[in-house]
């Protein structure tokens, strides 16, 4: 499943300058195969300074998401995945079912990022952790000719994912939208890679996409 995190300000920019791009996201929403995450309207750090402003921005953002995409976000993504347990508890009280955060090795210790975790001090909200190694293989290493795995093909990447079978709940790949076409140019083959990846992942009976 694909999740998009679009700030309120980027939606405003699309309204003003690229309504065709905004419409492309509307069409994606209609497929039922993508979801839109909640975040602060201005991609801000407001939770660290003013929680009332933080809550106001989230509500304003989610109204924008519902206006265009007819979805009410259930998962929250803070700016740059900044996280602590206090934030998770606050977000849970606002009605969210999940929150995204980094899968930091030194904090996970004997756990791994492919597990759904319940943050301390919460009742039922789940923390969805970024698998940074697999994410960075696409976001940063994909076109690196000095990388031992270059050139990376979809079937190879899917085989790495399949190794998690039976030892995790979900594999979260987080990357900036600019990964596709800017960090990794079209000439690298990134678009063909992404086109083939879902079907390669689905070749294993234990996996969904």
Predicted features and spans:
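Catalytic alpha-helical scaffold of carbohydrate-active enzymes acting on polysaccharides/glycoconjugates
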Residues: 1-74, 81-136, 143, 151-167, ...
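Short conserved micro-motifs at the rims of enzyme active sites and ligand-binding pockets
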Residues: 138-144, 183-186
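Glycine-rich, aromatic-lined ligand/substrate-binding cores of catalytic
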Residues: 176-190, 194-200
């Amino acid at each position: 499943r694909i999740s998009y995190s679009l700030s309120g300000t980027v939606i405003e920019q699309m309204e003003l300058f690229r309504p065709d791009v905004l419409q492309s996201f509307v069409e994606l929403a209609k497929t039922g195969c993508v979801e839109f995450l909640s975040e602060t309207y201005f991609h801000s750090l407001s939770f660290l300074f003013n929680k009332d402003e933080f809550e106001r921005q989230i509500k304003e953002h989610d109204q924008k998401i519902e206006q265009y995409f007819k979805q009410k976000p259930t998962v929250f993504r803070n700016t740059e995945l900044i996280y602590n347990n206090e934030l998770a508890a606050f977000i849970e009280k606002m009605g969210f079912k999940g929150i995204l955060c980094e899968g930091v090795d030194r904090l996970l210790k004997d756990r791994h990022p492919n597990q759904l975790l319940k943050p301390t001090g919460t009742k039922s909200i789940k923390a969805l952790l970024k698998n940074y190694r697999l994410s960075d293989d696409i976001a940063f290493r994909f076109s690196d000719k000095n990388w031992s795995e270059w050139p990376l093909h979809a079937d190879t990447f899917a085989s790495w994912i399949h190794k998690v079978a039976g030892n995790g709940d979900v594999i979260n790949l987080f990357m900036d939208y600019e990964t596709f076409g800017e960090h990794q140019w079209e000439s690298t083959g990134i678009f063909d890679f992404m086109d083939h990846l879902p079907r390669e992942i689905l070749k294993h009976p234990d996996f969904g996409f």
